[in-house]
Design a protein with these regions (language model features):
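Positively charged n-region of N-terminal signal peptides that target proteins for export
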Residues: 1-4
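Bacterial N-terminal signal peptides
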Residues: 8-21
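Interaction/scaffold regions that mediate signaling and macromolecular assembly across diverse proteins
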Residues: 26-259
Length: 259
């Protein structure tokens, strides 16, 4: 009898250990959630001036600094780093005040600089990180989930619209599915040109092709389950695939104050 109880307890604790998040604390993203609901419009355009004056956003950034991410479940960590990328990017726009694009070089009309993304200016989880650090060294390397490319927002009109809700441990998988499907069926994600028998797809599938190939064997096979029936049917005719020009224009509702 004692042996059966011991075995049962061992099984019980083993199951609990394997279930994601049983012992993990969820990080509080409610302040960021409220900011997104208040300052992002239905098109995903951002009121950077309003966010810059919002105390809740400042408090959220502070909370990211000493976060113990290792105590979160895998989904909790994924949600944390997506939100951290988006929050850091928003704050960099507020601090840098680009006029038309985060890739401005100082030469009118020339948008080629990557310094905005590569310069580590924020403390997140006790590390000084840049947006590129979060994207390439953490999200891509650790999670190997190409859907993150439709969740992290580069403050530009070519990237997916910034959602009006923060990611959480509970919603991250559902939200990733929704954002991927939404982007791929928008004009930013895919466009059909029947006269040229060409499907134009987002430049994201060129830049990060290895991520999609690793996941699904090819970029098209990754896309297929998310596409509307019209686009899937067009793909059956084996059209030419070309890439859309990426729009690096700032995703701001209005010019930033203090420019």
């Amino acid at each position: 009898m004692k042996r059966k109880i011991a075995v049962s307890l061992t099984t019980f604790w083993t199951i609990l250990w394997l279930v994601p998040g049983v012992f993990a604390n969820d990080f509080d993203h409610s302040k960021f959630d409220q900011v997104l609901k208040s300052y992002v419009d239905e098109k995903g355009l951002v009121d950077y001036n309003g966010i810059g004056e919002n105390q809740q956003f400042s408090l959220y950034l502070q909370s990211l600094q000493d976060a113990k991410v290792e105590e979160l479940s895998r989904n909790g960590q994924l949600a944390f780093w997506i939100n951290a990328y988006n929050a850091v990017t928003i704050d960099k726009v507020i601090q840098k005040k680009p006029k038309k694009s985060v890739r401005e070089t100082g030469f009118p009309g020339l948008w080629t600089s990557t310094k905005f993304f590569t310069s580590p200016e924020h403390i997140v989880a006790n590390r000084q990180l840049s947006p590129d650090d979060i994207e390439h060294e953490i999200l891509r390397k650790k999670f190997k989930d190409p859907r993150i490319h439709f969740a992290i927002i580069c403050a530009s009109r070519g990237c997916p619209p910034l959602p009006r809700v923060a990611y959480t441990e509970a919603n991250v998988q559902t939200r990733l599915e929704e954002e991927t499907k939404s982007y791929l069926n928008s004009n930013r994600g895919t466009r059909i040109n029947r006269s040229k028998n060409t499907l134009y797809v987002s430049k994201l599938f060129d830049w990060f092709s290895e991520d999609f190939i690793q996941k699904s064997g090819s970029t098209i096979e990754f896309m297929r389950p998310y596409l509307d029936e019209e686009v899937r049917h067009f793909l059956d005719g084996k059209p030419k695939i070309s890439y859309l020009k990426y729009d690096w224009a700032l995703n701001a509702q209005a010019p930033l104050k203090g420019e």
